């Protein structure tokens, strides 16, 4: 089971990587009519994938499929599995020029670091502190015995996490991180197995138990995705064949 937990922990970086990449690539975008047309391709692909998914569900599961269900399934983002990401991305895309204005108006690196600390504290940090049960000694030896935890820091803004990842992506594009690649790789591997061991402990004696710490606003995916993004960014592609690029 431990290997499966390691894999589950590692794969939790999937969505955060896309959000980091969005901030990294779109940090210079400005408000204009041309900008808004940029989402057209994404929406077209989404509609096509929704159509394909609904046809499959109709054939394989007997789900209702007609013009009405297709329109409603597209508009409410239920026709295609994991459509929630497109729903989130539409909002992030619309906000991006304004987020860029806010980020760009900060005068120096220190102010931008304060911005990152603020959004990370509001969205990511709660998943580090609000996950323990201090009311039961038995819980510490058997964490699967109860799902009750004490809140230690505010968590209302956790749903704001896409914007936190976006700003981190903006910062990485502008400043990067001054750390040796080898050190970063060691830190990534160490963090992966540390978090996996923690997740194994939290699930010991039963099937895998998820929690805020491993959700996309959790501290585990945040640390792993930022380190992995920085490592991928340092891969030199100049001498790679075009097919590999």
Say what each PLM segment does.
Residues 1-245:
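Alpha-helical transmembrane segments and their immediate juxtamembrane cytosolic regions
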């Amino acid at each position: 089971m431990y290997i499966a937990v390691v894999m589950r922990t590692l794969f939790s970086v999937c969505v955060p990587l896309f959000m980091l990449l969005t901030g990294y690539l779109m940090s210079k975008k400005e408000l204009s009519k041309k900008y808004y047309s940029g989402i057209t391709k994404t929406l077209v692909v989404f509609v096509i994938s929704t159509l394909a998914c609904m046809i499959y569900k109709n054939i394989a599961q007997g789900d209702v499929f007609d013009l009405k269900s297709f329109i409603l399934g597209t508009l409410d983002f239920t026709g295609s599995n994991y459509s929630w990401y497109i729903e989130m991305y539409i909002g992030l895309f619309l906000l991006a020029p304004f987020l860029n204005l806010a980020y760009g108006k900060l005068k120096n690196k220190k102010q931008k670091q304060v911005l990152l600390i603020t959004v990370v504290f509001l969205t990511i940090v709660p998943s580090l502190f609000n996950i323990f049960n201090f009311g039961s000694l038995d819980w510490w030896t058997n964490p699967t015995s109860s799902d009750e935890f004490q809140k230690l820091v505010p968590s209302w803004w956790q749903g704001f996490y896409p914007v936190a990842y976006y700003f981190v992506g903006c910062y990485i594009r502008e400043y990067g991180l001054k750390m040796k690649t080898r050190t970063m790789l060691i830190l990534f591997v160490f963090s992966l197995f540390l978090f996996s061991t923690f997740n194994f402990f939290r699930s010991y004696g039963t099937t895998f138990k998820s929690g805020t710490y491993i959700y996309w606003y959790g501290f585990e995916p945040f640390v792993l995705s930022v380190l992995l993004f920085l490592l991928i960014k340092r891969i030199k592609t100049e001498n790679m064949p075009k097919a590999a690029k």
